[in-house]
Amino acid sequence: MNQIDTGLVKRLIGEQFPEWAHLEVKPVKFSGHDNRTFHLGDKMSVRLPSDAAYAPQVEKENKWLPILRKELSLPISTPIAKGNPSEAYPWPWSINKWIEGETVTKQNVRDLSEFAAHLGSFLVELQSIDASKGPIAGAHNFYRGGLISVYDEEARDAIENNKDVFDETVLKHLWDLALQSTWNRKQVWVHGDVAPGNLLVKDGKLCAVIDFGILGVGDPACDAAMSWTFFDKSSRKIFKEVLQIDEETWNRARGWALWKALITYDANRDRKSTRLNSSHNVASRMPSSA
């Protein structure tokens, strides 16, 4: 496969959507891991899966996002057109409406507690939408909304590999707590990757939620993992209150955050990087975080 760059995007647009071939194509400032994203003019974006594992996300987003967006008060990713596999690129791809906003950071949020409340309210809205026909959590969304126990071996290996860095006993206890319960209520919609890179702010306030590639239905615990990766103690409390999360679900949410921090640290331990530092901070703070 050719490298995913502006040249490839221009070729695909020219071949499949010639009416937009005159528009400028340029990479977005922050592109994710699962997809490579490019501006298409001022009002659209092009998203191309970076690997075959992420290709099914295109069909899923095109099917469900137009339905979900009607029930949500905040803008979300909006598919405009779907590109087909071709000689130049082997998987389906999408053209979406461009949403104005900045990727959220601690520096551009007006008030962290306000942001936590607004994000919590959005997730409550998402969870209230009928999910009876939605895609059940599984391999297609890396089990977000499914049983966290699918990552048990991976998490325990990471704890063992890094017991010289973290408190092994405490982390094993937190992980065990996450495995002690399951979601036994009605399955709900989960975004699957509620993280700063997928949240936009304008004038310091949450203005949009994007990248629903690992959307699914199941246990909402995974969508609360940001409690430990972004919020401080007071904003974390507000987030929990707005979501009305019981303690067992809270333990599973913490488990999702712990698993991701541990495997990220384990994979990057031998090289200095922002990912190494941030994952270390999350795993180190977790024992003292309610």
Say what each PLM segment does:
Residues L276-A290:
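Single conserved hydrophobic/aromatic residue that forms the stacking wall/gate
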Residues A55, Q187-V190, A195-G255:
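Active-site Asp-x-Gly
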Residues R11, E15, K63, I67, ...:
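Generic recognition of well-ordered alpha-helical segments
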Residues R254-I263:
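Hydrophobic alpha-helical segments that form the core
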Residues T6-K10, N62, K233-K237:
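Short, surface-exposed alpha-helical segments at coil->helix boundaries
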Residues N2, W20-E153, D157-T169, T182-N184:
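ATP-binding pocket architecture of kinase catalytic cores
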Residues A55, R156-N161, K237-I245, I263-R275:
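ATP/Mg2+ or Mg2+-diphosphate-binding catalytic cores
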Residues M1-E19:
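Juxta-kinase regulatory segment immediately upstream of eukaryotic protein kinase catalytic domains
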